[in-house]
Amino acid sequence: AIAGYLKIDEAKIKKAIAGFKGVKRRFEYIVKSGSHILIDDYAHHPEELRALLNGAKELYPNKKCTVVFQPHLYTRTRDLADGFAEVLAIADEVVLLPIYPARELPIEGVSSEMILNKINKSSKRVLQKTELVDWVKSNNTELLITAGAGDIDLLLNDLKLMLEKKR
C-alpha cells in the first residue's frame, strides 16, 4: 500500500519481494540438501524455541530432529530452566552447550546440566563447543537446528563444511 502511494513501479515491488531472503538467524537455512538440513535461529526463550522446533518438525515430519541449544545468561537459565527442558524435549535429540554468559558472572549451581537433568528424554547430552562438530560428524543428524543468542553461530561454517562433505 505504501509503495503504491509512493508510486513505486509494481514490477520493482514484485522483484524486491521475490528476492527477499528473510531475516538472518531466524529459521535461517545454512545447509539444505536431500540428506542434511541445518537451520540456525536466535531463539533464546522457551516460547521462541517452541515455535522453532514445532515449525521444523511440521516441515520435516519424517526427519530425526536434533537441536543444539546454547543457553544465554545465567539468570535466564535459572529462571526458565523448567520451560527450556519442556520445550527442548520436542526434539528427538538434545545437545546443550555451556551457558553463554554475555554480561553476567556465573551463578553457583546454574549450568546447562540444570536444564539437561530436567529433560524427560534419554537422547540428551552437554557438549563443549569444541566437541560439537566431531559429534555431529559421527552421528546421524538429518535435521540439525542450532539455537541461542550467544556465539553458537560461530560454529556454523565448520558445521556447514562438515555436513556438505558428509553427503
In which residue ranges do the predicted regions lie?
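A glycine-rich beta-strand to alpha-helix segment
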Residues: 131-162
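Short hydrophobic segments within beta-strands
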Residues: 68, 97, 146-147
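Nucleotide phosphate-binding/pyrophosphate-handling subdomain across enzymes
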Residues: 1-93
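C-terminal helical cap/extension that packs against the catalytic core
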Residues: 85-142
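Short glycine-rich anion-binding loops that position phosphate/pyrophosphate groups of nucleotides
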Residues: 44, 71-73, 100-102, 149-152
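Short glycine-/acidic-enriched loop or helix-start segments at secondary-structure transitions
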Residues: 78, 105-106, 154-158
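A short, gly/pro- and small-residue-rich
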Residues: 111-119, 157-167
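A structural signal for short coil/turn segments at secondary-structure junctions
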Residues: 24, 60, 119, 139-140, ...
